[in-house]
């Protein structure tokens, strides 16, 4: 598949034209990515996990190049320090929490890992998964039996990102929340405030809302910041009568390249109407 000189050695392609041969250069396709971001799904025992199927079916229909779960797939309500000692804490079990989280991920993946479709999978550990690691720190005698390292995420095909370590995909940083380096706590404020603070495009979860900010840069490009922290189909009693009135859904980023993408937001209400059995 090439030209040889009189000694039998290959002639470099850049010399072919001088010998009267033309070479058709292979164009490298610079295709922007399509990325689906699954917000916090917070699977727990005794709730329906059908919403994971709806999300998975949508992913299969749209076939993004990358699927990012932004964290808090496992609720780990048995490890909540806020509820300990309350009546609502009665009956919670770690084993049931793990089983619910594992089942939710199986339901999600089963809907789109088929027919040759195999997107890149990225999982950003959330603060709810961090509860499991905190237990391992507090009870070192259980090392190897507890902690996120015992969850089957990697075996399921996910690239697992440590809690609060951002991952850069085409110039956009994905992480459960943006942490203030002085305190380790989440940055507050709107998506625009956070975008101005960190100076890079980002997608985060954690906060039960939908907030998006876009701003131009001096080089003629754009940056984007997205907060989308809920993709579960149940209400949380602790949030009260109005606290549950927030957006629930996922995000699809189209034409992702050079730190920007065009967002589309898909509500669980829409997914339920389209895919509910």
Regions found by a protein language model. Give the residues of each.
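Core catalytic region of metal-dependent phosphoesterases/phosphodiesterases
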Residues: 43-155
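Polar, enzyme-active/binding microenvironments
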Residues: 29-37, 61, 268-276
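Short acidic low-complexity segments
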Residues: 151-170
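Conserved beta-sheet core of the metallophosphoesterase superfamily
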Residues: 175-266, 270
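Acidic, histidine-bearing metal-coordination/catalytic regions of metal-dependent phosphoesterases
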Residues: 1-38, 42-45
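Residue-level marker for buried hydrophobic side chains located in beta-strands
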Residues: 35-37, 67-69, 123, 202-203
